[in-house]
């Protein structure tokens, strides 16, 4: 079945993008910086607004950006891991969208899944960013075929 986190937008790519912008870090460097940190600063896992407030306070305290990013990745991975457990999914888990290119998030998710003993393989395809567009195109083709099929049946009924 379909499940999503009920905890605000704190697991979204937009959240990570906002934090990167606030920290003055290029989005393509976020994953590398996160993986390069030996520490992870704890971040609120309740809501994006609270997490952003945490980040503002961390910056004011002089916490290095890589530790903040690693903390954010761990927080997101923790929520995703809980979601995977609740959904009762099977391997492999394919991460799609822009977050699939964030090596820090994928690494944190793999660590979290291993720590939680979920026994799941996490896969992040090279072109995962196109998954949503491909899905939309397939859905559009399906809907167009149904609409055309229905109108043809209706025409046959009216004229036949």
Q: What are these regions, as identified by a protein language model?
A:
Residues 85-112, 125-129:
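Glycine-rich phosphate-binding loops at beta-strand->alpha-helix junctions
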Residues 25-58, 149-152, 156-158:
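Internal, active-site/partner-interface "lid" segment
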Residues 13-21, 123-159:
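Glycine-rich phosphate-binding/hydrolytic loop that grips phosphoryl groups
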Residues 39, 63-64, 88-92, 118-119:
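Short coil/turn connectors at secondary-structure junctions
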Residues 51-83, 129:
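Adenine-nucleotide phosphate-binding core of ATP-dependent small-molecule kinases
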Residues 1, 108-117, 143-146:
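A glycine- and small-aliphatic-rich helix-loop capping segment at beta-alpha/alpha-beta transitions
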Residues 1-39, 138, 142:
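Glycine-rich phosphate-binding loop plus the immediately following alpha-helix
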Residues 1-6, 91, 115-125:
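Short beta-alpha connecting loops at secondary-structure transitions
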